[in-house]
Amino acid sequence: MGKVIGIDLGTTNSCVAVMDGKSAKVIENAEGMRTTPSIVAITDDGERLVGQPAKRQAVTNPERTFFAVKRLIGRRYDDPMVEKDKGLVPYKIVKASNGDAWVEADGKTYSPSQVSAFILQKMKETAEAHLGQKVDQAVITVPAYFNDAQRQATKDAGKIAGLEVLRIINEPTAAALAYGLDKAKTGTIAVYDLGGGTFDVSILEIGDGVFEVKSTNGDTFLGGEDFDMRLVNYLADEFQKEQGIDLRKDKLALQRLKEAAEKAKIELSSTTQTEINLPFITADQSGPKHLTMKLTRAKFEALVDDLVQKTIEPCRKALKDAGLTAGEISEVVLVGGMTRMPKVQEVVKQLFGKEPHKGVNPDEVVAIGAAIQAGVLQGDVKDVLLLDVTPLSLGIETLGGVFTRIIDRNTTIPTKKSQVFSTAEDNQNAVTIRVFQGEREMAADNKMLGQFDLMGIPPAPRGMPQIEVTFDIDANGIVNVSAKDKATGKEQQIRIQASGGLSDSEIDKMVKDAEANAAEDKKRREAVDAKNHADALVHSTEKALAEHGSKVDESERRSIEDALSDLREALKGDDAEAIKAKSNTLAQASMKLGEAMYKQAEAAGGAQQAGKDDVVDAEFTEVDDDKKKSA
């Protein structure tokens, strides 16, 4: 078996590492650099440039130089985040025939997976040159908050690059692996990962070679690119005030501004003032114009303060989901180039109440972790168990449009969980299983991932058939759902495909909506529960009345029928309290009928179980079969 490499496919830079004996080693590229810019360019004559050569010519070829394409991977063209990106990049973002966001140069379109594949190919070639052998297997990292579509698109990129992707792992988890492997560390750590395009925070417990993720949170559209653009807009605004020319309308000038902004941002991490000097940035009738400006660290920090503050809330949510306070975190590990910014380090220190750990290289630690995971899969690294989590709850729609969770967010993967459901109608011979992902109480408020039908259920009264629905999530976070009729053994299953994935804006919207609408969700859930209970009560009372109505006197029979009529009327509305009140009235009125049925059963000599039909729809038995395997 050949070497398995670890690749950090970053928004701004990528890095490749491999196990060398008992430790992981970062491999230098052909230009002698330990990281490679995640940039792809198409030249005038159609040549493809990747990495540093592509970055060097970006100023003279802005429309055919693709950067930060990772932010488009697995996204639909009509995604609000794509709309935002279109105004920030000089290259064209177009709508593909499948509705995804692709990029275009000289009339030729490329999917984000393709562009990412060009970068992965460069990583592959770098590793092959160093190892002197062919490499065809890799572990690739993704942001922890990446959804199914984005994970699948990343796997596709690996395939296009000629790599079999053995495992997709989360970036903060990889960083924790690199941080904790060679140290006899035990405790709870927080990984704060602010990279070029994404932000993740993960809380992990480390001990005896086990790396267990307790919770994860993040924002997949927050990173260094946003800090750069904030500075670009400031420089452009200042120049426009002075010269009356908007540099953002000139793609070449915009690219020069972007490079200058990135350089100034980096310099201000180690110095308190820098000078931005861009001669001949543009020209008008009076001649050439130059941009010269001094920028202090304080001014830059003021420009991006809200971006830094946006990282605080995901950290608090991750702590809450893990059931921990900031004081219970033993170490905070910084990952991603943006964590070199003093303001970011200051915010992390304030939030967690301790100095963040700076002993790892924030640009390389993720690739090193990926290489360690590759070593685990290859058998070169022993006694390491990696347990990651799924970022969003998964479940199905049950009677009344309720979202019934089968796997909660932050559940350790790989995992397999089942629940038993039943039918809502008498003699129902098929059920439609609709699979959703999200945090809201009602299915319609969440994202539908897919649906399938389970056919051939034998005729039976409602509530009698037992249909077992099973969710199976593998170590890559890829979902399988199956439904099985326990009586016949008939089974159907669905694999959630890339087209069923969520956009990050949808994920964030779901969580934020869930918090904002928690009270409303609870009220709607209560109304549906009351309706389901009332429906079952109406059904069982009607059946009992038809079979045993003659055993009660006329006045009691009439009061039962009146109560039935009132409850049916209440069921036409959504007033949970009214439905509950009418249900109680019917239950009281039906007591004499129950007594008559019980007496008859006693007289028959075999006391039978009464009220067998009073089944609450969508009641279930939970089967919890968490599989904690080596990731």
From Swiss-Prot:
It comes from the Bacteria. PROSITE patterns: HSP70_1 (PS00297), HSP70_2 (PS00329), HSP70_3 (PS01036). Disulfide bonds: none annotated. The modification Phosphothreonine is found at residue 198. It holds the Pfam family HSP70. InterPro entries: ATPase_NBD (IPR043129), Chaperone_DnaK (IPR012725), Heat_shock_70_CS (IPR018181), HSP70_C_sf (IPR029048), HSP70_peptide-bd_sf (IPR029047), Hsp_70_fam (IPR013126). Residues 602-631 are annotated as: Disordered. The keyword Chaperone applies. Keywords: ATP-binding, Chaperone, Nucleotide-binding, Phosphoprotein, Stress response. Induction: By stress conditions e.g. heat shock. GO terms for molecular function: ATP binding; ATP-dependent protein folding chaperone; unfolded protein binding. Belongs to the heat shock protein 70 family. Acts as a chaperone. PANTHER family: HEAT SHOCK PROTEIN 70KDA. This is Chaperone protein DnaK. It comes from Rhodopseudomonas palustris (strain TIE-1). The gene is dnaK.
